[in-house]
Amino acid sequence: MATMASTSNCSPVATSPLMMLLFKALQEGGDSEDEARRRREQLNRRPSYRMILKDLETADKVMKKEPEETPPSSVDASPLQFQSVMRPPPTAPPTSAATPNRILPSSNAASPYGSPLGSSILSNQPLVLPFAPINGDFDFSAAIAAASQPKVFPGGPQQNGLGGGGGGGGVPGPSSGIAGMSVQPPTSSTPSQQQSVQSLEGTSGLIGSAMKPMLGIDAVSFPEFGTTDWQSPMLSGGYSSSPSPTMTGGSMRMGGGPLHGEDESNRKRQVRLLKNREAAKECRRKKKEYVKCLENRVSVLENQNKALIEELKTLKELYCRKEKDGM
């Protein structure tokens, strides 16, 4: 009974290491499978060299496109700026004698839109607006509509910018030196003709006086139309404009030095071309040497062939002589 108890007590002790070994083996097998699966997942997640190169190329393209997408700075005047420049000089407070369409320029304050004729000429006579101002501003739509209408001269065909002389004299042209002043129409003309003449003269004078300080151009009279136009100094050869710093900066940024990636690629290409040239020179030199060596060998072989032929001839002659002597 004691021995059986001892065996029964020893059996679990003896079998426990085997079970532990089996359990460890199973655990290691499971761990190895998990590790293999984990490694496969990591390898799948890890980007390949092709993906890395693709990312680098896209980054280079983005860097190249960034300076190209920046638009060059423009110096064009906006319509609001143009409208602010085209506004007439500040008006004086209206009096009982002044009409809504008549502006009396003050002699104390100088107008910011001064003409080359001087402020004294403009201050002597009132400036006539052919249209009623809208909210204190000049009505540009009405001015454009009036300018598009044909100009009618009552005294017949105009000559040298003046209306033909019927009964009431001619309309003074812009060569008189006063642009945009009130025009005295002939007495025989109708009210619609007077209004058209005043609108044309007033519009041309206002636009001319407003555009002169902005564009820096001189007034030129055209006798065919009886209005003032502007001749740009660029047509006479005296125009010279300095580029703005924003434009020069944009052009330097756009077409200046290449980027770092382009510089590196150009340098590598030049190095590759130099290496190719050196290799081609070396190849040609070796080819010439090889051809010379072959020519030398051919000449040596030809000389040896000649010597062997002569030796063969002498041997034949000796052999023939011996045969003759033996017979």
Curated annotation (Swiss-Prot):
PROSITE patterns: BZIP, BZIP_BASIC, KID
Residues recorded with modification Phosphoserine: 48
Tissue specificity comment: Expressed widely, including in head neurons AFD, gustatory neurons ASE, the olfactory neurons AWC, and in the ASI sensory neurons, as well as in the intestine and gonads in hermaphrodites.
Positions of the KID domain: 16-75
Disrupted-gene phenotype: RNAi-mediated knockdown positively modulates lifespan.
Leucine-zipper: annotated segments: 294-315
Biased composition (Gly residues): 161-172
Major location category of this protein: nucleus
Region of interest (Disordered), ranges: 27-114, 151-200
BP term (GO), one: positive regulation of transcription by RNA polymerase II
Low complexity bias: start-end ranges: 173-199
Chain intervals for the UniProt region annotation (Basic motif): 267-292
Ranges of Basic and acidic residues composition bias in the record: 35-44, 52-68
InterPro entries linked: bZIP (IPR004827), bZIP_sf (IPR046347), CREB1-like_pKID (IPR003102), Leuzip_CREB (IPR001630)
Keywords recorded for this protein, A-Z: Coiled coil, DNA-binding, Nucleus, Phosphoprotein, Transcription, Transcription regulation
Span of domain bZIP: 266-317
Its biological purpose: Transcription factor. Transcriptional activity probably positively regulated by phosphorylation. Modulates expression of target genes, acting by binding to regulatory cAMP response elements (CRE). Acts downstream of the calcium-triggered CaMKK-CaMK1 signaling cascade, consisting of the protein kinase kinase ckk-1 and the protein kinase cmk-1. Plays a role in learning and memory, feeding behavior, stress response, entry into the dauer stage and modulation of lifespan.
Family: Belongs to the bZIP family.
Protein known as: CREB homolog crh-1
Originating species: Caenorhabditis elegans
